[in-house]
Design a protein with these regions (language model features):
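PLP-dependent amino-acid enzyme catalytic core
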Residues: 1-452
Length: 452
């Protein structure tokens, strides 16, 4: 028989460290309804030096040995160390590229701007990083005889796509609850295509979340939202991966959009492990960017985190973060405090214009990335972010999931947004003189009279 792993992890109450559960137990909160976190045996992990961890992670990168070629499972000892490899459900997620935004950065006065393109993955968003972990654990639970009938989630689009795909790969039934008419067609069709049971409910995300929590509590459906801390274990690898891609050098800033706030919490957790296990010695500053129409964390930040109050989120172009009562606010506040962090907001106009401005330099941004870019632009303008700082913006989803947003922007049909960078197609008769004149006129207008 193979030797058992030397490393271990468990669920632990945030409020009461003595309250623990096994990762294969069906539990989402502590006895008082508070959040759980996955805690690792750090003393066991520290028996391996920081340099040895670097060597191990580098040796697995982009390799085909199962399951270590995945950006998540290449760090298995830090994620789910005791999971049987045969129960891993992976689509080789992670390893998404860092885009050096040279032209966009120069336009803003930044010398070292990068975007972490988490949308360049199987279902088009960072949610794959967490869902591979959760669905793998569910597969193992079912193999052990646990009574898990199906997995379910409330979603504003990206979570449902990831859950449906990974559950389909594992032959596990998936049930998703979406706010009717509030997500893009591309986001809706993904769980439909992957065979999930899809409910479109006449409510917002928070209303869908209340329904799925009741179903998880009463009907044997395993909850896959980010209040389930297993998701955080996969999502935390984005911070680790960013540092690894910079040859283990820590950037000055990491800017990330926030809705349900699991992602900013996960980012900090991954960075914490890098420091505690000796791979790096410094921390970046973290910025959490929220849409102005769904900004409870920003409001709490402006009050010095004296209190946190849920709000009724208003409609926003950044539909995936239209969340007024985020589950992970306690973890997010802790992360912001410990990382000398900032919470910034972006109006609908600011997020749309920032996304379009960056698109003109070769990117293709989702509206949520637009929120992060707009926050960054504000911090550059007020001098908080300096010219020479190395800045990484986490782009959370692929722009192709939001083509309606793109089309309406360029057709100047978004209410309250002026569209400073519209680029609608030029419709002409198919006659060479007309086409030539229009082409030369546009080249001169856009690039100057002496454009090469």
């Amino acid at each position: 028989m193979p030797a058992k792993p030397r490393h271990s992890a468990w669920f632990q109450s945030l409020a009461n460290p003595s309250e623990r559960y096994g990762l294969d137990e069906i539990v989402y909160t502590d006895r008082n309804g508070g959040l759980l976190q996955v805690v690792h045996d750090m003393e066991a992990l520290k028996r391996t030096s920081g340099n040895r961890w670097k060597e191990l992670f580098e040796s697995r990168q982009h390799k085909s040995e199962w399951p270590y070629g995945s950006g998540v499972w290449g760090k298995k000892e830090w994620v789910l160390p005791e999971l049987e490899p045969d129960n891993v459900v992976s689509m080789y997620e992670g390893h998404t590229n860092l885009f050096w935004a040279d032209r966009y950065g120069r336009e803003l006065g930044l010398e070292d701007l990068w975007l972490k393109l988490c949308g360049n993955t199987h279902t088009g968003s960072f949610k794959d990083l967490g869902m591979t972990v959760l669905v793998s654990m569910v597969k193992e639970m079912r193999a052990r005889g646990k009574a898990v009938r199906a997995v379910g989630c409330a979603s504003t689009g990206d979570t449902s796509a990831a859950l449906a795909a990974y559950a389909a790969a594992a032959a596990i039934p998936a049930i998703v609850f979406l706010p009717r008419g509030k997500i893009s067609i591309a986001q809706l069709i993904q769980p439909v295509a992957n065979g999930a049971i899809v409910f479109a409910l006449d409510t917002d995300f928070d209303g869908c979340m209340e329904i799925v929590k009741q179903i998880a509590d009463k009907d044997g459906i395993y909850l896959a939202n980010s209040m389930n801390s297993l998701r955080i274990e996969g999502q935390k690898t984005v911070g680790i991966e960013i540092v690894q891609q910079f040859d283990w050098e820590v950037p000055d800033w990491i800017i990330i959009p926030g809705g349900n706030l699991g992602n900013v919490s996960a980012l900090a957790k991954g960075l914490d492990m890098l420091v505690e296990l000796g791979l790096v010695t410094r921390r970046p500053r973290i910025v959490c960017a929220q849409a102005q129409n769904a900004n409870p964390l920003y409001r709490a930040y402006k009050r010095g985190f004296e209190s946190f109050e849920p709000i009724a989120a208003l409609p926003t172009l950044a539909s995936a973060i239209q969340i007024g009562n985020p589950v992970s606010y306690v973890k997010a506040i802790d992360a912001i405090k410990r990382y000398d962090g900032i919470v910034e907001e972006a109006s609908e106009s600011e997020l749309a214009e920032a996304a379009a401005r960056a698109d003109r330099t070769g990117l293709f941004n989702c509206p949520h990335t637009g929120v992060a870019l707009a926050a960054m632009e504000k911090l550059v303008a007020n001098g908080t972010i300096k010219k020479s700082d190395r800045v990484v913006v986490v782009s959370t989803a692929h722009g192709l999931k939001f083509i309606d947003f793109k089309l309406k922007y360029h057709e100047m049909r978004i209410e309250g947004v002026e569209s400073y960078f519209p680029n609608p197609p030029i419709e002409l008769a198919a006659k060479y003189p007309l086409v030539r004149d229009a082409m030369l006129r546009e080249i001169e207008r856009r690039f100057g009279k002496h454009a090469a």
